[in-house]
Amino acid sequence: MALLQIAEPGQSPKPHERRLAVGIDLGTTNSLVAAVRSGVAEPLPDARGRLILPSAVRYHADRAEVGEGARAAAAQDPLNTIISVKRLMGRGLEDVKQLGEQLPYRFRQGESHMPFIETVQGLKSPVEVSADILRELRQRAETTLGGELVGAVITVPAYFDDAQRQATKDAARLAGLNVLRLLNEPTAAAVAYGLDKGAEGLVAIYDLGGGTFDISILRLTRGVFEVLATGGDTALGGDDFDHAVAGWVIEQAGLSADLDPGRQRELLQIACAAKERLTDATSVSVSYGDWRGELSRAKLDELIEPFIARSLRSCRRAVRDSGIDLEEIRSVVMVGGSTRVPRVRSAVGELFGCEPLTDIDPDQVVAIGAAIQADALAGNKRGEELLLLDVIPLSLGLETMGGLMEKVIPRNTTIPVARAQEFTTYKDGQTAMMIHVLQGERELVKDCRSLARFELRGIPPMVAGAAKIRVTFQVDADGLLGVSARELSSGVEASIQVKPSYGLTDGEIARMLKDSFDYAGDDKAARALREQQVEAQRLLEAVQSALDADGERLLDEEEHLAIAAQMDSLRELAGGSDTAAIENQIKRLSQVTDAFAARRMDATVKAALSGRRLNEIEE
């Protein structure tokens, strides 16, 4: 009798055979696929040896043409040649209309307000267009590697929201790809440079692609990246440089800005080519129609300076949000083809005070990092590196006011991992905070597992809500959880370490998960009630404090009685279980105290400015 060989899904029936997995950088302008071969991560070429695949799709009546040929046809067939589709992913028709001047396509609204593009092959959604690009990359990889892929790690901008991330997953599924993980582009870049294996410290990832800009500030501790802050702009990139140069050509040539789609696409291609040549040259000739002109690098710098300045503002904001100084950042990684522009590199170097890392091709660095991650997730690593495949079985979080569980690291998150979240004080003058670390999927503390408690003391006394306490959860490759709390203005800090999985059997984990599903509706309602009760108590205490301080001075008797009546109503309702009634009464009390709050603010400002000269205020 014959024996059937049964392999686990996604795994080879031969335990020592490498599983084929790739990293994909699905970019706005260009896309790449990379894989680890002979221990080295490298981009995979097509049959003609080209590594970069332009993110362009041209639709014919019976087929889709992807890549170089499609991009070359953009000027002659602009309505059927879709480029920069990444800008449309996960967006509604109203969002797309805001990009209308830059996009020559005809749009139709589909279900759920999804935009569809009219082509000779029929209506195409952004997901379908992206799927055609991913399908081309999948076929390239399978041809080059000589086998079927078990999966791919696909990178996305850190700024992508849930809708954009889901659209990317949908496109991959249409292309026949199993998504091992969506990886943020900044993290992929850091992995490509091996910064996860280097010295501990702070790293900035400056990612300026064709259509999106991301800045991320990362802290590396014991091989774990903690994202301190992210920022950026989903509508800023090399495309804007091209439009700026195109606008300059129109002005110099005395042309009308109202060009038809074909001429607009042709002009943008000329502008892009001029920009790229100025990476090495100090001046280039530009021609469009009968017009001939000279574009210098200095002029290009002038044209794109507003866009560079926008990116640097985002950088400063991200550094400020992370609570560090610029001088503390030890490395700056440059990602994206637009970072080849000399002025971009020099401006970033000036801001951070260090030479940016540009050793790896900025067009390839994200795909290379994704390939390294894909190789690990496919199970090709041996020894300690396999710890990367461990996941957190139950969510980790802490207790907030009202006995609520606030999840910081969701279950099934791969370790090692670090996540930070900011919290604040509940009462005026609060100088200490109890951090209660929890594990579980339920909404209320009483239904979760208590892991540890510790106190943060020495918080400067402030009004409720003014203090900022950053709580960081970090799980290392051995599953050891470290929780630290730091008050940002004073720097006071406290921490604890605990083994989250200790003492839990697989059966207990399964039971906790089952309970979270069975009681999901009840838990959601209970959480909503607790949140409104906590907000009611907070508002009552704040109003009472204000009345004690300024009530007699700023309110007449009628106003005082009106506020007191609304407070009594809220106290009564807050003790009950009618969530909607509590919420409505909170609104009524807020409305009746609006004028009182405004008077207090005016009095505070007047007192602060009293006795100061105008020039002192302006300074």
Swiss-Prot record:
CDD domains documented for this protein: ASKHA_NBD_HSP70_HscA
Pfam families: HSP70
GO molecular function, one term: ATP-dependent protein folding chaperone
Function: Chaperone involved in the maturation of iron-sulfur cluster-containing proteins. Has a low intrinsic ATPase activity which is markedly stimulated by HscB.
Entry's family note: Belongs to the heat shock protein 70 family.
HAMAP family xref list: HscA
Protein name (record): Chaperone protein HscA homolog
Organism this protein belongs to: Pseudomonas paraeruginosa (strain DSM 24068 / PA7)
Gene: hscA
